[in-house]
Curated annotation (Swiss-Prot):
It comes from Arabidopsis thaliana (Mouse-ear cress). LRR repeats lie at residues 98-120, 121-142, 145-167, 169-191, 192-212. It is a single-pass membrane protein. Residues 318-365, 547-569 are annotated as: Disordered. The modification Phosphoserine is found at S382, S395, S475, S569. It comes from the Eukaryota. It is found in: Membrane. The lineage of its organism: Eukaryota, Viridiplantae, Streptophyta, Embryophyta, Tracheophyta. This is Probable inactive receptor kinase At5g67200.
Amino acid sequence: MTLNFFLPFFFFFILLRVSAGAEPNYFNSLLPSDAVALLSFKSTADLDNKLLYSLTERYDYCQWRGVKCAQGRIVRLVLSGVGLRGYFSSATLSRLDQLRVLSLENNSLFGPIPDLSHLVNLKSLFLSRNQFSGAFPPSILSLHRLMILSISHNNFSGSIPSEINALDRLTSLNLDFNRFNGTLPSLNQSFLTSFNVSGNNLTGVIPVTPTLSRFDASSFRSNPGLCGEIINRACASRSPFFGSTNKTTSSEAPLGQSAQAQNGGAVVIPPVVTKKKGKESGLVLGFTAGLASLIVLGLCLVVFSLVIKKRNDDGIYEPNPKGEASLSQQQQSQNQTPRTRAVPVLNSDTESQKREKEVQFQETEQRIPNSGNLVFCGESRSQGMYTMEQLMRASAELLGRGSVGITYKAVLDNQLIVTVKRLDAAKTAVTSEEAFENHMEIVGGLRHTNLVPIRSYFQSNGERLIIYDYHPNGSLFNLIHGSRSSRAKPLHWTSCLKIAEDVAQGLYYIHQTSSALVHGNLKSTNILLGQDFEACLTDYCLSVLTDSSSASPDDPDSSSYKAPEIRKSSRRPTSKCDVYSFGVLIFELLTGKNASRHPFMAPHDMLDWVRAMREEEEGTEDNRLGMMTETACLCRVTSPEQRPTMRQVIKMIQEIKESVMAEENDPFR
C-alpha cells in the first residue's frame, strides 16, 4: 500500500523534470513513444505555445487537445485552426504508426513535409491552408491505405508525380491553389469522387480517363495552359513531337527566301526601305533598265539558238551524242570562227546552269521543316491510316522518357490512337539519314505476335519519330509493381511462365531474322500488354542508332538489366546480352522485386531467395519454381559464351510447360 501511495508522486516528479527540460533524452526514454512524438512535434510547430501539451498538467496524453486513442495508441490527431506556427519537423509525428487521421489544416505551418512513410495506417491526411512548400511529398506515395489527401492552398511546386496512381484507394484528392506545373497524370483511381487541381500552373491536354471524365471544368479552372475535351478548350495546334515547329531560317527556304516570305506558293519580295525618295527612284530606274537588258539578251540567245539549230539540221554542225566530236567534226570545228564555236558552248553552259539551279532548288526544298515524308512500314504501306498533318494536329500525352527518347500517346482527329516516340536528336546524331532509313526499313518490317509493330517513321531536320500501335493495358512493369501494395504477393507462377514464354518468342524472332538485330534494351518497362494481355516487346533494335560512348547514366534498375560485358563499356549489345536481360526479367516476374534488388548467388541459393520473396513454403510448387529459377540463372551467367541462345531458352520453357501438364493430368496427384 505504501508503494501505491508514493507511485503517483514519483511519476509527477518525473513529468515535472521532463516539462522543465532537465535531461530530456533520459526521461523521454521512460515515456510512451506516442507522447514523445506529440511533444517533439509541439517543440517546432507551436512556436506561439497555443497547445497546452504539458506533462505537468495531465499525464494522460490521450486526453490532450485533438488527440484520440485506441488501446493506448493515438489513432486521430486533429489540430485544425488552432493557431500553430512553425515547421513540421521530421521524426516527430512519423512515430505514430497507428495514426488513421492527421489534420493540420488552417494553421501557419511552413517548410517542406517530412517523411511520413512510417504512417502505414494513415487513411486521411489534411494539410490544407498552410504555407507548406517544396515538391510533392514523395513519402505520401507509399501510404497505400490513404483515402483522403488534401494539401490545397499551400506553396507546393514542381510536377504532380504519375506515381500518385499507386494510391488506388483515394476517394478525395485536393491539390488546388498551389504552384504545381507540368502535365496532369492519367489518374485511374476508380473510387475518386472529389478532385480539384484549380489554381496551379498545369499545362497540356487533360487525359481523358474514366476517372477524370467524372469532373467538370470547375475542378481544373485557373490553369491557363490546360486544354482538352473535358474542359471544352481546344489545344494549340503546335505538335509536341518537335522542339519547335518554326525552325525555318533564310538559308533553309527555297531560293534563299525565308518561310515568312512565302504566301500560297508565291514568293513575296519585301520592299526595300530607304530614307530618301531620290535613292528609291534611282533603284527603280536601275532595276527597270537592267530588266530590259536581260530581256534583249534573252531574245538574242533565242535567235542564235534557232540559227545554230538550222545550221545543224543542214549538216553544218552536229555534236556526238556522247559529247565527243568525230575526227571530221574536229577538223571542221577548227576551221570555224570563234563566234560559231562559242554558240553551242554558251548554250550548253546555260542548260547546265538550269539543271544546277533545279538541283539546288530541290535540295533547298527538302530542308524546309515538315517536308519529310511519313513512311509507312510493312502492310501499313497500302493502308496509309493517317498523314503527317494529322499527327501534327493530334493531342498528345506524355507517357514517359526512355534511354533513346520521349514517348507520347497521340489521339488523332479521326479518333485513332497511336504511340509516338521522338528520338533524342543528340543521341542519334551519329546515324545518318540514309542509315536511319535503311535500318527502319528492316526493323519496320518485323511482324510477330509478341512485338509491338512499327507502323511508320519520319525524319526531317534532325527530328526523328517512330510510330507504334497504342497498347492501353500498360506495361509489364506496371503489372508487376503498379499500384499494388509492397506487401502483396508477386504474380502467380503460371502468369510468370506465360509472360516469360511470350517474351522469349519475341526475342527469338528478332534474333533469327538477322544476326545483326538485337533488342538491346530489354526490361519490364519496354514490354507492353496486348489486347489479350500477351506480352509484346517495344523499343526493340533502337540501340544501334545511338552513340553508346556518350550514353547517359542509367538508373540502377536499367543498369542491372545490362549484361556485365556492356555495363561499363561502349560495346554494342549482342544477342547474348538480350539473353542476360531475359534472365533478370524472370527473377523480376517471380519475386516482384526491382532488378537492382536481385542478389547474385548459386542456383540453389537463388531458389531459396525466390521462395522467400514469394512467401512460399518448401515443396509448394517447388519443382516448377526450381526449373524457372535454373533457367534464369543460366541466362544470367557472367560469361556470354556460356549463356544459352533464345532458341534453347524456349525449349527449356516448353519443358517446364510439359512438366506442368503431366502433373495436372496425373490422376494420382
